Amino acid sequence: MGWWKTRWKLGYRFKKLTQRAYKEAGVKQPIGIVNVPLWPKSFMDNFKDISFEKTHDFNFIGCINIHPIIKENRKWVIPFVKKHFTERSYLRLNSNEDLEVHKKIGDYDHTFSYKKKRFVDKYMNLGMNRCAFDKDYYGVMCSSEFTLCPAGDCPDSDRFFETIMSKSIPILEKQEHCGHNKKLENIGYKFYLLGDDYVYRQDWVDYNYDLFLKTHTLLNKRR
């Protein structure tokens, strides 16, 4: 078992979102290590202003060359893009490091046409901004049938949960990338791995979303 599977304690972003979830729900947060992240109602309410109409098939928004570990974990992304992305797809690399080396791949590549600053800076100085809701980022996922969810600086993907709450189907390199501990990995979400046949399943989307609301929110436990 890799070291990340014993890393039960939540990182900064998940910790802050979980604290907000308990506070907004008026529920006392349990004492001790929390290993399943929660999203607060105020965060989930942002989706009310976003369309879930599927205008894209595949999408990926993020960084690749920002850090050696991330570059290694995401080395499969560009080959996948070149093989599977279509005129309906959406790609955007959003770090200065990517802009320096990337060459536009196709009409679906919006890397050089989008000027907004990337979500995470080179030195991972996250701060509270990392807990903010990026409407453009989530909007693309909400309008996509599938979202690429590569590992980041650790062998798991926060994007996996973001994809599910956006009602898109995750595509992972490996099974264990769906969570940084066994409890998360065994929740039971449905997703595709590299090499699968990527068939859009509305029943998967509905199942995953309902499971997410039950497992990762306190929307049904408010005072």
Where are the model-predicted features located?
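C-terminal "capping" alpha-helix adjacent to the active site of nucleotide-linked donor transferases
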Residues: I187-F212
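Nucleotide-sugar donor-binding catalytic core of glycosyltransferases
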Residues: M1-F161, M165-Y189, L211-R222
